[in-house]
From Swiss-Prot:
Listed Pfam families: NADHdh (PF00146)
Entry keywords, A to Z: Cell inner membrane, Cell membrane, Membrane, NAD, Quinone, Translocase, Transmembrane, Transmembrane helix, Ubiquinone
Location(s), subcellular: Cell inner membrane
Gene (name only): nuoH
Topological relation to the membrane, as annotated: Multi-pass membrane protein
GO MF, any single term: quinone binding
Transmembrane intervals: 7-27, 82-102, 115-135, 161-181, 199-219, 251-271, 287-307, 322-342
Protein name: NADH-quinone oxidoreductase subunit H
Keyword Translocase recorded: yes
Gene source species: Bartonella quintana (strain Toulouse) (Rochalimaea quintana)
Length: 348
């Protein structure tokens, strides 16, 4: 009995505990990042934003949660009921499951696997199924058109993201996210004679063009402005979510924002040194790594929100041209250049 507990039950309980803790922290983080998104957008437009529920409106996201949960879900008469209700669960579950391999600090991940980057890419490519299911099951042309747009957009920019990840893998020599962070503890800043490890060693500097491509592709992959053609209010209203209400709509919304925070976390890990402090000095090393990680995620999300506030929406043909005719050839060329440089210089 003791062997069964130590070998099987205890590891299972630890994994379940880690998962529940991550889920609670992630949902709270998403709630306040959504609040920050609305506040930033309001500030740019000289409005006050959410300011009624709780002090300074800090409880607005939780009030919205209660509102969605207590509402009655309405299913269109001609909809495929099973697929219609399954689609938002698929979207939210896939978005949440990618966080299993995200290390928020040294050794702080639910599942430690040495191909974490490949796992994230694989799960992210499946998220399009939830969108397609929701658009098709609604039995309406507008959700279906929005779903087709979303599928084409996500597939188009996943290619560029894939090539960006290849360059990071070439520089780091690993698919393990923890190893990728460790590799950024020394780099071009140290090579150029900077007295101690710093933010100049992170991948954002040595791979700056790929950093920009990844950031813009992340906006397109998550259907954020200026690439929110899926939810173009003047054309398709809310895209594939037009016929959804109540809890199913909330699950789609949750999946969308969890995916956005995931892209912010990936940007932090791949290019901004993960949980590493900006300067390797004792008074910054004293700050826990998870604090640096969360601050960097919030910094990236701030720019996600600012782009939404001041960049106008692209036309659909411009969106596709940017992905296939600009980002794809440029990222492919960068892969070749990076691989050639590493082979003939010996840097790694």
């Amino acid at each position: 009995m003791d062997d069964f507990f130590m070998i099987w039950l205890l590891p299972l309980l630890i994994i379940v505990g880690k998962t529940l803790l991550l889920l609670v922290v992630l949902l709270v983080l998403v709630a306040y990042l959504l609040y920050a998104d609305r506040k930033i957008w309001a500030a740019v437009q000289l409005r006050r934003g959410p300011n009624v529920v709780g002090p300074w409106g800090l409880l607005q996201s939780f009030a919205d949660l209660i509102k969605f949960v207590v509402k009655e879900p309405i299913i269109p008469a001609g909809a495929n009921k099973g697929v219609f209700l399954l689609a938002p669960f698929v979207s939210a579950t896939l978005a949440l499951s990618t966080w299993a391999v995200i290390p928020v600090n040294e050794g702080w991940e639910v599942a430690k696997i040495n191909v974490g980057l490949l796992y994230i890419l694989a799960i992210s490519s499946l998220e399009v199924y939830g969108v397609i299911m929701g658009g098709w099951a609604s039995n309406s042309k507008y959700p279906f058109l929005g779903a087709l747009r979303s599928a084409a957009q996500m597939v188009s920019y996943e290619v560029s993201i894939g090539f960006v990840l290849v360059t990071v893998i070439l520089v780091s020599g690993s698919l393990d996210l923890t190893t990728i962070v460790h590799k950024q503890s020394y780099g071009i800043g140290t090579t150029l004679g900077f007295p101690f490890n710093s933010f100049l060693d992170w991948n954002w500097l040595v791979l700056f063009p790929m950093f920009i491509i990844f950031f813009i592709s992340a906006l397109a992959e998550t259907n954020r402005p200026p690439f929110d053609l899926v939810e173009a209010e003047s054309e398709l209203v809310a895209g594939h979510m037009v016929e959804y209400s109540s809890t199913p709509y909330m699950l789609f919304f949750l999946g969308e924002y969890v995916a956005i925070v995931l892209m912010c976390a990936l940007t932090t890990i791949l290019f901004l040194g993960g949980w590493l402090p900006p300067l390797d000095v004792w008074w910054l090393n004293w700050v826990p790594g998870i604090i640096w990680f969360v601050l960097k995620v919030c910094f990236v999300f701030f720019w996600f929100a600012m782009v939404k506030a001041f960049v106008p929406r692209y036309r659909y043909d411009q969106l596709m041209r940017l992905g296939w005719k600009v980002f794809l050839p440029f990222s492919l060329a960068m892969v070749v250049i990076t691989a050639t440089f590493l082979k003939y210089t010996g840097f790694a």
